[in-house]
Amino acid sequence: MRKTEKKVEFVKKKAIMLLLAAAVIGSLCGCGARSETAPPAETAATVEPATETTAEAAPDETAETEPTVMEGDLFLKASSVTFSLVGEQEDIYLGVIPRELVSWESDDPSVVSVENGVLTATGVGTTTVRASYADRSVSCTVGCLAETEEALLQLDTDILCAPKRLPPEVDLEEPCTYFDNSAIVGDSITFIMFQWESKSNYLGDMLFLARGGTSLNGIARRFSNIYYKGTEANLEDAIQQSGVERVYFLLGSNDIGDPSQRLLYFENWDIMLERIREKSPDVEVIMISNLPQYDDLDRPERTQPHIRTYNDLMVEYNAQLRQYAEEHGCGYLDLSYYIQDHFGRMAKIYHQDNYHMNEAGCLSWMKVLRYYAKYELEGGTLS
């Protein structure tokens, strides 16, 4: 029994010694681990701010960017449009701001509604249509005279003989230099405008190359020349010698009125353009639409047959002239748009006689030229 007790005693002591040794070793190992993995105090302080800086520099993918606001004015074709009948439509927007960015509103859609610049007459009356973009806005007075043609013909003659559209307002008294390098070519219609313009200088130093009775056929076939600096000259020579950069044309009314000259209308344009561009290859050419004629009968529906025929032909040839201008790299300015009454004739307030415009008509013409000049300066194009 003594040997057994001694053996047990020895085993107990050995076990206790092993436990103590393990505890000491474990304690030493634990200190060593903390020393190797924990960074020095200075290193830890340096790492944390770097992490914060990176977080601040990261872009916020959810933040919304401000839309770019475009420069330029809103340009409408007219300051006033009066439809003849319910159901008529018209696009009054020119630019320069893209159409899809412009907001449109009608004060009374039951009279005239508007969508993306297109007006629709929906009822009889008068209202206002507004276009806006960013901090810019512009308005147009719009209306409609009648629901049926029968009701339209019952209206006062002065209403039916008034212009369907008025040009945008322009301060003609403000000095203008846009036309200082421009010329305008025409017949007696243009010559009368020259007489009024020379009293006001509303078109600056524009050069007038006008001669009464002339025509496309007369100039192209050398039957009549242009006066330049007091002497007769071929048109292409006058343009070259003047050094102008831009030439407006209002020619063709005498051609439209003559059956034989009508047949040569665009052939004569071909001849004139070829000659002009041969001597002045960089000159800009703008074709102005021909104008309707006036009839002073008491009722518009009783327009004289020859005037009705001419005005119908004018519409046809103006449409072809617009297409011709586009195909031949020329600008096109629709002056007739502003001169017509509700029956497609020259408005009563603009006529001097059946063919020529008075001072009011010429002032409207000058407003149109000035307005479209501003439009071009801001990036618009004539077409």
Regions found by a protein language model. Name each.
Residues E36, A63-L153:
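Extracytoplasmic soluble-region selector
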Residues M1-K12:
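N-terminal secretory signal peptides that target proteins for export/translocation
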Residues L172-E267:
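Conserved SGNH/GDSL esterase-like catalytic core that processes O-acyl groups on lipids
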Residues K14, C31-D73, T141-V185, I189-Q195, ...:
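N-terminal secretory targeting modules
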Residues F10-S35:
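Sec-dependent N-terminal signal peptides of Gram-positive bacterial secreted proteins and lipoproteins
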Residues R222-N225, N254-L263, L273, P305-N311, ...:
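Second-shell loop/turn segments in exported
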Residues Q293-S383:
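Catalytic His-Asp segment of secreted/periplasmic serine-dependent ester chemistry enzymes
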Residues S280-E284:
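A short helix->loop->beta-strand "cap" motif at the edges of active sites that frequently abuts
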